[in-house]
Swiss-Prot record:
The species this protein was found in: Homo sapiens
Entry's Gene Ontology molecular function annotations: copper ion binding; electron transfer activity
Tissue specificity as recorded in UniProt: Ubiquitous.
Chain residue ranges for the region called Disordered: 64-92
Record protein name field: Cytochrome c oxidase assembly protein COX11, mitochondrial
A GO biological-process term: ATP biosynthetic process
Keywords: Copper, Disease variant, Membrane, Mitochondrion, Mitochondrion inner membrane, Primary mitochondrial disease, Transit peptide, Transmembrane, Transmembrane helix
Localization per record: Mitochondrion inner membrane
Major place of residence: mitochondrion
């Protein structure tokens, strides 16, 4: 340090230690001048400055004092630039509005999914679901097709979230188009608390769903079972006589009716329909 020092020079802690000659002040020295301690001038100034700082390092004066910071870029006064910024803000607000609307729509659709699915499937017979077309006058006037025997197989499944015992009371029955049939499923709640379940159904083959008409069933309805309670749930149905006239059904001799029970969140409690 002594070899670098000259009489009248001072050690300036600005972006690394520098020796500033008083006769040739630089802009950096002038800007740092208000921060120099009086005792740093003279022969021992550099040594005392280093002892006070502790080590050689980059200065942080520019970050600590506004006088040493570069001038801020003023906001653009260009009308075109301002228009671009306003357009960008407007587009961002529009995007947020669309995202919020989609989120609300998806939430509403999730609540309406089961009723809409039930209405659609029962009306069209698509998705392998039965058709709700069983007017009493039609049932009374149906003519059974005796030479067309169909085997109806029954299947039962329970979702992993529902701790129920669920099974068909019969594995299969034989019917003919144009006559009604009655089958039963049995469900039991083996737990020590009330549980509410809800079921969906499916029919295989897919094309036979439009001819499989349910007069009474327990699908899409909440079923509440108390601890250890067991119930028999009926399925009253018939195969439309037009089944025998459809060329696609010529080789169809087996129809499978399958139910799957899921656990339902408790909303309004519905009684078990028609089990008395």
């Amino acid at each position: 340090m002594g070899g670098l020092w000259r009489p009248g020079w001072r050690c300036v802690p600005f972006c690394g230690w520098r020796w500033i000659h008083p006769g040739s002040p630089t802009r950096a020295a002038e800007r740092v001048e208000p921060f120099l301690r009086p005792e740093w001038s003279g022969t021992g100034g550099a040594e005392r400055g280093l002892r006070w700082l502790g080590t050689w390092k980059r200065c942080s004066l520019r970050a600590r004092h506004p006088a040493l910071q570069p001038p801020r870029r003023p906001k653009s006064s260009n009308p075109f630039t301002r228009a671009q910024e306003e357009e960008r803000r407007r587009q961002n607000k529009t995007t947020l509005t669309y995202v919020a609307a989609v989120a609300v729509g998806m939430l509403g659709a999730s609540y309406a999914a089961v009723p809409l699915y039930r209405l659609y499937c029962q009306t069209t017979g698509l998705g392998g679901s039965a058709v709700a077309g069983h007017a009493s006058d039609k049932i009374e006037n149906m003519v059974p097709v005796k030479d067309r025997i169909i085997k109806i197989s029954f299947n039962a499944d329970v979702h992993a979230s529902l701790q129920w015992n669920f099974r068909p009371q019969q594995t299969e029955i034989y019917v003919v188009p144009g006559e009604t049939a009655l089958a039963f499923y049995r469900a039991k709640n083996p737990t020590d608390k009330p549980v509410i379940g809800i079921s969906t159904y499916n029919i295989v083959p897919f094309e036979a769903g439009q001819y499989f008409n349910k007069i009474q069933c327990f699908c899409f309805e909440e079923q509440r079972l108390n601890p250890q309670e067991e119930v028999d749930m009926p399925v009253f149905f018939y195969i439309d006589p037009e089944f025998a006239e459809d060329p696609r059904m010529i080789k169809v001799d087996l129809i499978t009716l399958s139910y799957t029970f899921f656990e339902a969140k408790e909303g309004h409690k519905l009684p078990v329909p028609g089990y008395n």
